[in-house]
Amino acid sequence: EVKKALLDAGLSEKNVNAWLSDVKDYNKTIKNTGLVKKGFKKLSTKNPQYDENKIMELWNKKYPDFIGYNCRITAFDLMKDKISVKADAKVNASNLFMDQDALKHAPAKKFTKKQKHAFETLYSTLNTAYTTDVDTHIKKQKKAWKQNEVKISGTKASLITVVFHSSFGKNENELSIGHAGVLVPTKDKKLLFVEKLSFSLPYQVLKFDNRKQLNHYLMGMYDTSWGQEEAKPFIMENTNLMKDYRVIRKDK
């Protein structure tokens, strides 16, 4: 069902098969620890919990040097031939050092040089203003992508990114992409969200009725810092703000 939805959305069979083989390898390596047996399981109010220690132990046995793929690599890998950037785009890959390590030690070469450049451009860290006003940061993110000519086209699938603001004081503020996934429509008018939770945690496919539910899930997962002088995370769909994005948790 998932493969069909990905292919129907216009993603290349090669990329989809590569994703499936990564998923199979991962699940086999961790011996399906904590995974749903078949089909979909209803999400309770709490997001899925996995036994990370057990997973890590099994993973490290097979891959002592390779930390696994993460959300950004997985999402980009599915959509890499639909994403283009300026050849001389400005890159700040300071937050991607673990991604780079994973790609370096991966069992197979994931990206060409050009694709790696697009990967690092898309997920570049940006300097931003010292403010908790989300709109200011959204404009910054959009402007940077526009300047770097980041384009996502030729597919019904969309790239979902969760952008975080980090403040290290008045003069040092950054935007970075903390999570990414791929959203595809299904035949029955639902949405499938394909993600890898982290380097060590599983691949997940979640089914939502609409973007409002997806927003609820993602903000529940990632809007977690309290009392910081930082703006709320925001969610982009391709290069625009996701429709139905809103802050759910109002801080007092």
Give the ranges of each region predicted by the language model.
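Cysteine-nucleophile amide-bond enzymes
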Residues: E1-K252
